[in-house]
């Protein structure tokens, strides 16, 4: 009797564990009608992924089953796969590659990469939480959209496959039809292509239909409209969407262009965490934590709400506050707001709260970012101007005494664990 009980417990453990074997072992992509399906150990699996390793407990509670990384040593990958096992998730493990085309003619660099890839493949070839290897991320963004680079990606793909027969092999490109055609020409050994796309998400189906590449793909980064794609002020400050506008876009892009595409095996939403890129909030699905004076503790944004809704197909019992707009002196960001040095101004945030909770408003002014990264590389947090203000009022009055380009940030908190965000760029000019 005890043996029978233990047997059924084992079966249940296998059923509910993401990283487990079944009678059919391995990861495969199979043709299905006019698209493709992914099978992990015999189970059809659609990838509901996040970019990054932050708060994976929230990711799984929200319906995610995978996460993506951008690189790592053997020891770092071991830690990553331990995280995956603890959270019952799969990993698309990145392998960092240079964007400098010259290096693809450098034997020393290529030998180094061959050894790194060989060691990774040999070490993790049997790991059941590993989904796929991602060779490089947007290498074509520099000047490496060349045959030599893609031929080396093909060489590394073949090297991995000669060692690791369980896991898939991919590479990741930006939204670049030319790079997609290069992959079709030079890299036939890939199991699927990863593509990072933001604003042109609606063009994805047509792009793949018109491309020479005819295989499966995943959307390996996606999210709000990028700062390079949006409207800017007359002084070139990009205008960021409110968190409510982002929430709507996340849901629309997922349902209309990701899950509805039969060639798409799933996606990794970006960024499941927080980063500085033009602003502290542009791609961040969680807000900052432990910043001096700022009473934020890594709360969830409405984009987390959006993903839970589309992943689970269920409505949430608690939702984020809806920020309708922020104005400065009754003007919107699109109005190219210019203020005078030393003259007080008033900002206002208009909010809808379905649950009628008491709200806390946090106001912060930062200088407009001037130290800018490339391709998502590190950017420092811009300098703060004045003090952070926290109140229960949806209006804020202050004065700037030095000319320059600035951005006013508004955060709306309640007791649900969500925070809604908005910011408006403005310029302060000297009095005539």
Model-derived features: where do they sit?
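Positively charged n-region of N-terminal signal peptides that target proteins for export
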Residues: 1-5
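C-terminal motif of bacterial Sec signal peptides marking the signal peptidase cleavage site
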Residues: 17-18
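Active-site mouth of glycoside hydrolases
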Residues: 26, 30-33, 37-190, 196-203, ...
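Substrate-binding clefts and catalytic carboxylate motifs of secreted carbohydrate-active enzymes
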Residues: 32-33, 40-49, 209-378, 391, ...
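Residue-level recognition of secondary-structure-to-loop junctions
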Residues: 353, 390, 396-402
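C-terminal edge beta-strand
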Residues: 422-429
């Amino acid at each position: 009797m005890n043996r029978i009980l233990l047997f059924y417990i084992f079966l249940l453990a296998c059923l509910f564990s993401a990283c487990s074997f079944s009678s059919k072992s391995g990861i495969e992509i199979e043709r299905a009608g006019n698209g493709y399906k992914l099978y992990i150990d015999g189970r059809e699996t659609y990838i509901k992924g996040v970019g990054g390793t932050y708060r994976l407990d929230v990711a799984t509670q929200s319906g995610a089953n995978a996460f993506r990384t951008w690189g790592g040593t053997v020891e770092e990958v071991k830690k990553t796969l331990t995280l995956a096992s603890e959270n019952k998730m799969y990993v698309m493990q990145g392998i960092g590659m240079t964007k400098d085309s010259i290096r693809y003619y450098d034997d020393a660099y290529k030998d180094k990469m061959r050894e790194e890839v060989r060691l990774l493949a040999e070490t993790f070839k049997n790991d059941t939480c590993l989904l796929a290897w991602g060779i490089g991320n947007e290498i074509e963004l520099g000047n490496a959209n060349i045959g030599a680079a893609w031929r080396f990606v093909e060489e590394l793909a073949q090297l991995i496959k000669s060692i690791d027969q369980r896991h898939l092999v991919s590479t990741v490109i930006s939204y670049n039809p030319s790079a997609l055609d290069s992959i079709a020409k030079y890299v036939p050994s890939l199991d699927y292509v990863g593509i990072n796309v933001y604003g042109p998400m609606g063009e994805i189906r047509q792009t793949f239909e018109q491309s020479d590449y005819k295989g499966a793909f995943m959307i390996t980064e996606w999210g709000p409209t990028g700062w390079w794609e949006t409207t800017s002020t007359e002084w070139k400050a990009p205008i960021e969407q409110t968190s409510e506008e982002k929430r709507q876009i996340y849901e629309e892009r997922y349902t209309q262009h990701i899950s509805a595409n039969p060639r798409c095996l799933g996606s990794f939403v970006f960024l499941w965490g927080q980063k500085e890129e033009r602003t502290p909030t542009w791609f961040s699905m969680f807000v900052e934590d432990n910043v001096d004076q700022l009473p934020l503790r890594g709360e969830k944004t409405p984009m987390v709400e959006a993903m839970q809704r589309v992943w689970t197909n269920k409505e949430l019992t608690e939702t984020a506050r809806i920020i309708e707009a922020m104005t400065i002196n009754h003007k919107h960001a699109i109005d190219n707001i210019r203020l005078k040095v030393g003259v007080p101004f008033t900002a206002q945030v208009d909010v809808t709260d379905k649950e009628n909770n008491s709200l806390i408003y946090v106001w912060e002014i930062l200088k407009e970012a001037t130290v800018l990264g490339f391709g998502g590389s590190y950017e420092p947090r811009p300098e703060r101007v004045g003090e952070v203000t926290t109140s229960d009022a949806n209006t804020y009055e202050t004065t700037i005494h030095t000319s320059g380009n600035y951005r006013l940030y508004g955060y709306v908190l309640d007791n649900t664990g969500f925070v809604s965000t908005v910011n408006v760029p403005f310029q302060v000019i000297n009095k005539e």
